[in-house]
A protein has these predicted regions:
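Bacterial Sec-dependent N-terminal signal peptides
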Residues: 1-22
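Short N-terminal segments immediately surrounding and downstream of signal-peptide cleavage
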Residues: 20-36
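Extended, well-structured beta-strand/loop surface patches
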Residues: 22, 39-90, 97-189, 193
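Alpha-helical adaptor scaffolds
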Residues: 183-240, 244-248, 258-259
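Boundary/linker segments of alpha-helical solenoid repeat arrays
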Residues: 229-231, 260-272
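Alpha-helical linker/edge segments of TPR/alpha-solenoid repeat scaffolds
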Residues: 242-252, 262, 275-285
Length: 285
């Protein structure tokens, strides 16, 4: 008996060591991006094609899908956001979908704790949006979710790609509401005379195609409060150019050019000289 015990004791370490570790078939993935003031966090699993037909086969059409593998896909917004054209409150959600040949349904569900779609309750859906799939020019071996199409208006797209299919859901931050409220309070109601604030307001109106005449007023005032800031004069010139007031735009650009020469800003001098040439051409037409 003692011999048997001794023999088993000798074999036990070998059994404990004898193992083969393989990476998961559907590795985890996670990312965090910022759109406007909103932090977007997403975690999901990335299954692979492995020479299989995906949509309409492995992932059937018109059936709820966990939008990944393993645990349910989770998405979290730090602030309210417009998702697929609909306002969504800040918080964490389960991201589900119903793939279709001609149309997909993208779902945000209150329950982000499920394993896949087991226990999914449609009554907990906070949003359903319909999107059209498009053909991807390249084959995507592994399922991928990423943010794409970032734009200056604080918008982007949540894109899902697998096989030769791409799905995009438009996302837009509510940053504009907050910024416009701050501009309203500080520059319109209180009429704060601060060069930096006035320039920011003018920039925001200019780049987001709002009231250009108001932007011009703020930009000119910022110049009078900070006479040696080249960026303020450049912005004034850009606003005047968009308003097609070319003679005045040339004057503002000339002012910026003089400041650039005075400060030995070689690159700015070159750029402004080119800009003035371009403005003179536009003026002559």
């Amino acid at each position: 008996m003692q011999a048997i015990v001794y023999f088993i004791t000798l074999l036990l370490p070998a059994f404990l060591v004898a193992q083969i570790d393989l990476p998961p078939a559907s590795p985890d993935a996670a990312w965090t991006h910022q759109v406007g003031f909103t932090q977007i966090e997403l975690s999901y699993s990335r299954p692979h094609m492995r020479n299989r037909k995906i949509f309409g086969a492995l992932v059937p059409y018109d059936v709820l899908w966990r939008t990944g593998a393993g645990e349910s896909t989770r998405i979290k917004f730090s602030e309210d956001i417009v998702f697929g054209g609909k306002l969504v409150k800040k918080g964490q959600y389960g991201l589900y979908s119903i793939p279709g040949k001609e149309e997909w349904i993208i779902i945000l569900n209150q329950d982000a704790t499920l394993h896949g779609d087991f226990g999914y309750d449609e009554k907990k859906d906070v949003l359903r949006v319909k999107v059209k799939p498009t053909n991807s020019p390249t084959t995507n071996e592994s399922f991928t979710i990423e943010l794409t199409d970032f734009k200056p208006d604080y918008s982007a797209s949540l894109e899902m790609k697998w096989e030769n299919t791409s799905i995009k859901v438009p996302i837009m931050s509510t940053a504009d509401d907050r910024i416009m409220a701050q501009i309203q309070e500080n520059l319109i109601v209180k009429k704060v005379e601060n060069a930096g604030l006035l320039n920011k307001g003018a920039q925001y109106y200019f780049f987001n195609k709002k009231d250009l005449n108001q932007a011009l007023e703020w930009s000119i005032t910022s110049e009078t409060l900070s006479v040696d800031n080249i960026n303020y004069s450049v912005l004034t010139a850009n606003i005047l150019e968009r308003l097609k007031r070319y003679p005045e735009a040339i004057e503002s650009a000339q002012k910026a050019l003089e400041l650039a020469r005075k400060k030995d800003m070689t690159d700015d001098v070159k750029n402004l000289e080119e800009k003035i040439k371009d403005l003179k051409i536009k003026k002559s037409k």
